[in-house]
């Protein structure tokens, strides 16, 4: 029988500069815009340039067809470490855990973990249409 695995602690990793952009029920802006706004607030709060961010974790359901890699170019980032986590409410926790491990491994020094979506007039219906086969079966 194998010995139980002992998880490594998160010592030496710091989570700082939490940012929250005020909620708007409906918006004509894209999720990309909201994520960019959050990233700007994060960089300002940390007192750094966005160019110093060398890790980027993004969570969103409404940036399609773009993913985190496309957004890095749009936002002027050049990360050494990149993650796209489209898993809904648990994405924030996953982003922080993965980012912490990336810092511990030396893959990045400063990781921005951002999430953003938008709710335009038809967003909910379009999201359900393409969310999953299970959602399609339940809705149609």
Question: Model segments located where?
Answer:
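Active-site histidine-anchored catalytic micro-motif
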Residues: 94
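Conserved "HGTGT" condensation-loop signature of ketosynthase/thiolase-family condensing enzymes
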Residues: 1-87, 101-105, 112-140
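Short helix-initiation/N-cap motifs at beta->coil->alpha
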Residues: 89-91
